[in-house]
Amino acid sequence: MQVVHTIAEARRARAAFDELGFVPTMGYLHQGHLALVERARAECPAVAVSIFVNPTQFGPHEDYARYPRDTARDLALLEAAGVDLVFIPTVEEMYPAGFGTYVIQPAADEVLEGAARPGHFRGVATVVCKLFNIIQPTKSYFGQKDAQQTVVVRQMVRDLNIPVEIVIVPTVREPDGLALSSRNVYLTPEQRAAAPVLYRALRAAAERYAAGERSGEVLRAVMREVLSTEPLAKPEYVSVAHPHTLRELDQIGPEGALLSMAVRFDQVRLIDNWLLL
């Protein structure tokens, strides 16, 4: 496994491969990340992973400085998973003095995570675009857990004619339903016991949908009701949206819907979603 830190090194290393699967990460890897790597390994002759905690996607009062990091552990996991190339740039390598070009999708900033975290998707789209230009993968793998991110990346690839296939991998969950996230490490034991309420709320709405309910407001109410059973859970938003535009739905049509939510447990903010088809 080759580990590189500069863009020039990454490009030289990339030249050794024909087809390449790519998994961009912020490190502190868990089984969800490894599921992306496993899928890439199954579909591509070589796999690259990036580890970069991207400052431009964090707001001024968010957790950039304390975001968990453990590069040695990450590298051991990636080597065991059969990864060929790991790119670990510094902030200065990715954003040198004078950097001033960003990828912006105004529509993404108006809804869900974009509305809750101003500037977040400007940072996400910009760093993913840069990584695609540096690594030039054949396919790139993203988790369904970050549903809006997958929509943003797919639109960017389409709009900017970036020659990469985007592959979305289902969310990996704990046995009690909690979606795997690097931020779960912040949860106290009491918060961790309460956190599966997100999954229960989504599942309850999905069951109502399966039984024939098509009202967006009814399904939002179902999710809020389940969340209200957990005193530690403070919902930031609860959404029933179109799966492509992410606009809120009054009635769910033939294209289905994306159920999603952001919930705070004191300082810890968790997101989760469920795709209704």
Swiss-Prot record:
It catalyses: (R)-pantoate + beta-alanine + ATP = (R)-pantothenate + AMP + diphosphate + H(+). Its main location: cytoplasm. It is found in: Cytoplasm. InterPro entries: Cyt_trans-like (IPR004821), Pantoate_ligase (IPR003721), Pantoate_ligase_C (IPR042176), Rossmann-like_a/b/a_fold (IPR014729). Pathway: Cofactor biosynthesis; (R)-pantothenate biosynthesis; (R)-pantothenate from (R)-pantoate and beta-alanine: step 1/1. One of its GO terms (biological process) is pantothenate biosynthetic process. The active site is at H33. Its EC number is 6.3.2.1. Beta-alanine binds at Q57. The reaction proceeds by a bi uni uni bi ping pong mechanism. NCBIfam families: cyt_tran_rel (TIGR00125), panC (TIGR00018). Belongs to the pantothenate synthetase family. Homodimer. This is Pantothenate synthetase. It comes from Chloroflexus aggregans (strain MD-66 / DSM 9485). The gene is panC.
